[in-house]
Amino acid sequence: MTYNEDLKREIPTGWKVETLFKNSLTKLIKTGIPTFEGEKIYLPTACISEDRITDTTTKITYENRESRANMMPIPNSVWFAKMKNTNKHLYFGDYSQDRIKQIILSTGMCGLECPDYALEYLWNFIQNKQFEDTKDVLASGAIQPAINNNDLNSIWVLVPDISVLKMYSQRVKPLLEMKYNNEEENFKLEKLRDFLLPMLMNGQIKVG
């Protein structure tokens, strides 16, 4: 074990302490989305509760989207809400392609791209209460306090040895993938509901 001045505690020898803004595991995802045809589901932060998508009814086109609908999820990325006192997190693994193709996120979310072997570790990191507490302390602004990219320089990340990260990923990835698959089934059922409900209300289809 080695004492680390930044964390004020001992850490395993060979592990590193870096900032969330600049570290060997993540890359900040920039705003901007490619053009797309048809409609996509827009997820403002209000449609996310903790780590669950709660509302998929807001549809946008590339031309009619609001300015905040400008973040594109990518495989192997974790996301958290920037605003103070908002416990909202999302992750996208290499198995999340179907969902990624369908949704656009708000600029109220901060996205971090990471290697596949570090996704589960970083997901655990941003879900930790200590991370949320630190985020809330750093948040600034008179009306809607939130953190900005520079604030990420003040959030420390403990970076384990790559062999530890791979071992952790090997054990946790199947659980997250199972969770995602269950959510995706619900996601598809919600889309079917949203498609059929107007037809039912208009008398285009009948039940029974």
List each model region and its residues.
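Short coil/turn segments at secondary-structure boundaries
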Residues: 1, 33-41, 137-139
